[in-house]
Amino acid sequence: MDELEKNGLTRRDFLKATSTAAIAGALFMGDPRAVIAQAVEKKTRVVLVRDKDVLDEMGNIKPEVLERMLDQAVTTLLDENDPAAAWKRLIKPADIVGIKTNQWGHLPTPKALENAIEKRVVGAGVPEKNISIRDQGVLDDPIFVKSTALINVRPLRTHHWSGVGSLIKNYIMFSRTPWGYHDDSCADLAKVWSVPEAAGKTRLNILVVLTPLFHGIGPHHFNPEYTWPYRGLLVGLDPVAVDSTGVRLLVAKRKEYFKEDRPLNPPPKSIYMADTRHHLGTADPEKIELVRLGWEDGILI
């Protein structure tokens, strides 16, 4: 019996884990040699819900459809039939709730989604006075400072410093010196999740993929040519798993658009490192259960 078998790991398991780790390394680090061999573990669930009717002919959001999508995602994530019951598992009446959004001018968190989340939090028994919705200024917001629960919600896009604007990156406003995380393609962004104002508080992560931005060059890049009406939400309890799935979506869209492999630049190291260095969650696609709901045309992943 060799060392692999002594540890309960067959050669087949080892080869599978090694190959999937290589894929993950290539995806997030831009380097297929970034390999960490791990045995297969229980998968973390991410729900992708899409609805072709969530956007009208002008690209405007239909709030009632978006609210229904949110309910479908959360009930599926938690194996519940009733949205109210699902939210009561996430949020308790005594909670003080910060809804951390993103207000980047070209692609903000939709107001309709903020409203839908707040409606469900209130429905779980939280008074409106104990809820705050904001992006910047969270460290000066008394609700966020005293919060017992956070909901993390932002759109998916490419990003000049970190490769992707992600759920992990969305908490950078919990630092008074966010520029301090820019080194090495923002590889250690997950550190900010350990500050007292954020640590252990996140109940739900929602990555908005209604009209993601899949390409751009420069610090403030935005060209609507590089967005597309994907009409979806990615939802999970694990921010790393949701972000990892978002990266897969962007990579697939870039390949479809450019007709060749076009890696994200810079590579989204922060997502891989959030798993392997900071142990915030799971980045390996082989360890993620992706549940797909709704519209299937052009799903890409």
Language model features: what each stretch is:
Residues 1-301:
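N-terminal and secondary-structure boundary signal
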